[in-house]
Amino acid sequence: MVDRLANSEANTRRISIVESCFGAAGQPLTIPGRVLIGEGVLTKLCRKKPKARQFFLFNDILVYGNIVIQKKKYNKQHIIPLENVTIDSIKDEGELRNGWLIKTPTKSFAVYAATATEKSEWMNHINKCVTDLLSKSGKTPSNEHAAVWVPDSEATVCMRCQKAKFTPVNRRHHCRKCGFVVCGPCSEKRFLLPSQSSKPVRICDFCYDLLSTGDMAACQPTRSDSYSQSLKSPLNDASDDDDDDDSSD
């Protein structure tokens, strides 16, 4: 079906509409063989609060952006190659329901659908696209993924020393390896994580010690379904600001 749609006028028109919604700041999306599989609004768990984001699933990439005017204008376009994507379901917990993790070597995050059916459809379509891509390319799924950042609202004290309380002066930072919220003194070191940046990035002392000894796996994040506190803040429907988890800290 995907091959049949690839060169259809309807598919070309749909992709052109998506391009126009992102405007000149967005990347061109029309290439031979690319098919728009589906689209919809998902709640993305950002650093400070959950936010509505518009997602577009193509047969080779996943695109999302901030909603300025629904179905008319989006900005802050992000493009994720599907061949690098792994997804994992998240258990329902309180108000956080119908979620899954989108994991890549450069960035990982949680998203939530409005219904269980919508979640199932998204996950099934993403998995099929990834499987088809890997089958055609002969590549193997990536086993290295960036940490999913723990939302700021889940940590009132440093998650490493368990002592430092966060205040407007004592700021929160995120370890790029484990995703924990940590204080400045517990994250003064930097380490080169090539999949995330060409420059050394901030990591916590715990991960630094493990990485320095070559124990890369020991500091892999384990908190895949613990985001319950983040929905205590209301959903920000006006999503014309940057993703909070794109900040430097």
UniProtKB/Swiss-Prot annotation:
It is a peripheral membrane protein. It comes from the Eukaryota. GO terms for biological process: protein transport. PROSITE patterns: PH_DOMAIN, ZF_FYVE. The PH and FYVE domains may be important for TNF-induced localization to the endoplasmic reticulum and for enhanced cellular sensitivity to TNF-induced apoptosis. The FYVE domain is important for binding to the endosomal membrane. Zn(2+) 2 binds at C175, C178, C204, C207. May interact with EEA1. This is Pleckstrin homology domain-containing family F member 2. A zinc finger (FYVE-type) spans 152-212. InterPro entries: PH-like_dom_sf, PH_domain, PH_domain-containing_F, PH_Phafin, PLEKHF2_FYVE, Znf_FYVE, Znf_FYVE-rel, Znf_FYVE_PHD. It comes from Mus musculus. The modification N6-acetyllysine is found at K44. Residues 221-249 are annotated as: Disordered. Induction: Up-regulated by TNF, bacterial lipopolysaccharides (LPS) and phorbol myristate acetate (PMA) (at protein level). GO terms for cellular component: early endosome membrane; endoplasmic reticulum; transport vesicle. The modification Phosphoserine is found at S16, S239, S248. Residues 35-131 form the PH domain. May play a role in early endosome fusion upstream of RAB5, hence regulating receptor trafficking and fluid-phase transport. Enhances cellular sensitivity to TNF-induced apoptosis. Residues 221-233 have a biased composition (Polar residues). It is found in: Early endosome membrane; Endoplasmic reticulum. GO terms for molecular function: zinc ion binding. Residues 238-249 have a biased composition (Acidic residues).
